[in-house]
């Protein structure tokens, strides 16, 4: 049992796992920010532009609620396509942000790859043989 715990500790403390965990936490927080931007800023403005529509209220009612006084006997059944539009916009914004991030990382890695490497000097024995060859060519 102790060996399994040690192996798990080694696995959990590797750089990739910790980096991934940090990425997931930051990604979750970023998703909440984007959702708030879409729900609280973008969708009200879009709704105002298209005639004061609240997108979260857009739905197709398949079955109306059955009420008895103030008591709901059977809830309404509806297709909430307005909420779907809002969530789709969330996804598009997050996907675009991730695309820009990946594009930036790829550009940085290309710059690192394209940096010219200094030519490696040949070993001393190869240099000596090259000098001997050149001297023999010049003496002919």
UniProtKB/Swiss-Prot annotation:
Homopentamer. PROSITE patterns: MSCL. This is Large-conductance mechanosensitive channel. GO terms for molecular function: mechanosensitive monoatomic ion channel activity. Belongs to the MscL family. It comes from the Bacteria. Keywords: Cell inner membrane, Cell membrane, Ion channel, Ion transport, Membrane, Transmembrane, Transmembrane helix, Transport. It comes from Parabacteroides distasonis (strain ATCC 8503 / DSM 20701 / CIP 104284 / JCM 5825 / NCTC 11152). GO terms for cellular component: plasma membrane. NCBIfam families: mscL, PRK00567.1-4, PRK13952.1. It is found in: Cell inner membrane. The keyword Cell inner membrane applies. The gene is mscL. It holds the Pfam family MscL. The keyword rRNA-binding does not apply. It is a multi-pass membrane protein. Channel that opens in response to stretch forces in the membrane lipid bilayer. May participate in the regulation of osmotic pressure changes within the cell. The chain crosses the membrane at residues 11-31, 82-102. InterPro entries: Mechanosensitive_channel_CS (IPR019823), MS_channel (IPR001185), MSC/AndL (IPR037673), MscL_channel (IPR036019). Its main location: membrane.
